[in-house]
């Protein structure tokens, strides 16, 4: 088919899609053309923007996030939480009629713990140098920074928490009879809350040693201030683990002789103790909502969604995926839109950053910048600027146009929400529907623009 004829057919197809999505729905049409909160001007949409912008709904995405963050909770690489999330994501994408592939890969053991306090259970890290696969129950004794541990703490759960490094005091507690040790970290910087961790101990001990997040340490100390507290602690070494990438694709509507594809991606795992609402449940549900919206729209390229496992342990899932691609496969990818932390409610993180590894423009950053201009969001965006640390990196290293898109502070890329990587990264405390909607519109419009051309 001649290029001009193909364009006419494509334009007609988009028109039909637009009619189906907004032409018969005055409310949706009005929403597509209204000026957004925080936008500089009313949108000046191109023809392909309408069927995307009129249909994406942050509230639909939120329903997926309630499953991932509230119901499943922490999604640690290779463990039950990540596997449940994998199954949910795959089921949603299959129901949307995508061709779904699960890509397994082996990962290292994970050392996790739990603390049962009354009716609450907190997930923590546990030390590989402590006793594993063990449960201990006892009265908690708070020894502050561990500099003055009583001579006899037999059978007690010794709690050590301070701003300074508290790891060394564990050995004294173990030698004096502690049943288990809880190490808490209290951050000196009020803008950076500290996460649960797996303590590295210079000398192994034969009791469980758990690493608490800052908020867990604070909550435990608050309970202790009211009286005696009894807890049940457990340590588990998760062995022989397999993590998964979830890949979903639909072919181009029209002849695609070069088999070109546009990728929209996010990671679905989280760090220990964190339900990962923003990091990166938000990016994951953005992908699921865009998969719904884009599934029937006419395209000149294939659309591929990829949800990565094991990002939090070194981009393992995306690196594995890229390592399995042939050179022709790599050259077929027009662009990779990575979405990592796209909905924080933290007020100072009001800039939507375009983050390429080298700080240079590429097809993805240009498409998002153009979409921001059309939608009136240009003043809320910055970049591209140089930043790695997410799943766009392996693609960039192979020459694929790729970038990460994320809400962060205006003062710098490191200005993330204080609840980053903590148990406080919840829907209630750290999700903005308005910012999620902006992210959906920007990535949806940008990705569809690449898919159409």
Where do the protein language model's features map onto the residues?
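N-terminal secretory signal peptides and thylakoid transit peptides that target proteins
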Residues: 1-17
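C-terminal segment of N-terminal export signals and the immediately downstream linker at the start
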Residues: 24-51
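Noncatalytic luminal/extracellular "stalk/propeptide" segments of secretory-pathway proteins
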Residues: 43-47, 51-157, 167-168
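Catalytic-core environment of secreted peptidases
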Residues: 44-47, 55-77, 91-99, 150, ...
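Second-shell loop/turn segments in exported
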Residues: 48-55, 71-80, 159-163, 169-170, ...
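Metal-dependent peptidase/peptidase-like ectodomains
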Residues: 56, 298-299, 308-414
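Soluble metallo-hydrolase cores and metallopeptidase-like ectodomains found primarily
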Residues: 120-150, 197-277, 292, 296, ...
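His/Asp/Glu-rich mid-to-C-terminal helical/loop segments that flank catalytic regions of hydrolases
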Residues: 413-453
